[in-house]
Curated annotation (Swiss-Prot):
Name this polypeptide is given: Acidic leucine-rich nuclear phosphoprotein 32 family member A
Domain of life assignment: Eukaryota
Sequence segments annotated as region (Disordered): 145-261
Biological source species: Drosophila melanogaster (Fruit fly)
Basic and acidic residues composition bias: residue spans: 238-252
InterPro entries noted in UniProt: AN32, Leu-rich_rpt, LRR_dom_sf
Family: Belongs to the ANP32 family.
Locations listed in the record: Nucleus; Cytoplasm
Amino acid sequence: MEKRIELERRARKVNQITELNLDNCRSTSIVGLTDEYTALESLSLINVGLTTLKGFPKLPNLKKLELSDNRISSGLNYLTTSPKLQYLNLSGNKIKDLETLKPLEEFKNLVVLDLFNNDATQVDNYREKIFKMLPSLNFLDGFDCNDEEVQSDGDDDDEVNGNDSDEVGVSDEDDDSDDSDEEANGEVSLSEVYNDDLEEDNSDWEGEDEAGEEDEEEDSDIDDADGDANESAASVNAKDKDGEKEADESQVRGKKRKHDG
């Protein structure tokens, strides 16, 4: 247990630690936990193997104590040095009778007690007697004095930790509002993306149309150039033919002159 305590401290000052979890660390007694933990408000010792509470330190600010699934059968008087205790879980231990629970009368602020899976719960009128013994108690084994079940584990923790249920409700409303805002923002962004895609598609079509027009103009220019070239070639051929014709006529006239001479 001592090594586990040092590990959980994580170099923090002892008098500044408010919560300590020593579950499953395996020890039959309290070892290494001292009166120096004056700020401790929550202590968990679930399934440690404790057979006695002898040596339990004086913890003036302790409000929540988890001792379930151990082998404790007596010695609850060692807990009375923590007068602010509001939540005590002793389920799964070896408590056999109500007399063993008498020391709990010292806890004037105790509102939640769990004794489930202890032989003491088999005593006749057990619940009625416990509520009478502990007037401040609101819940015993998960039910109130009218056998109404606790709403949730979080409700007990909120009450022990001093959290107001109204504040929790406000927080829930804020969360819902945030979710709505996120959904609205999500819709806007999707719409913007959709519009952007449409604009890009239109731009692509316009680009293709312009490219098509440019191609047509280029084809027209090429056709015009080909036509001009053909006309020039035809003109040259015509001139060549005229030249040949004139040359032939000149030769004929030359021969005629020679003949006449």
